[in-house]
Amino acid sequence: MGQMLETRRRMIRSRGRTMRLIRRATNGVPQQTVDLMGFPRLYRPGEIEGAIQQGDQQVEILADELDAAGFGAPTTGHLLVLDGRQVTLQGARPIYEGADLIGHSLWVRG
């Protein structure tokens, strides 16, 4: 394990909250859910550009919980239950340390 992963784990453990990521059922594939820890934050005014809107959030998660659940990578259209409300993934960016996938940075709205 690298330093970036350990730093990310500490941040999510200290500031994170429990949330649920949901892949909706499509084309005969059943709905899948995974409970995980994530660290949400609002985008700062200087970060609001392009398709990002005021009120959108960035959520940092680890890859460990997704891997353990066999969930796969989060993608646009997945749902996230955050603080009791449901938001929709607008995008997700994988986070690597070297060649190792260590997490995802999610862009959510709702």
Show where each model-derived region lies.
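Short, conserved turn/kink motifs that form compact alpha/beta structural patches or helix kinks used as
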Residues: 20-110
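Active-site-proximal polar cores
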Residues: 1-32
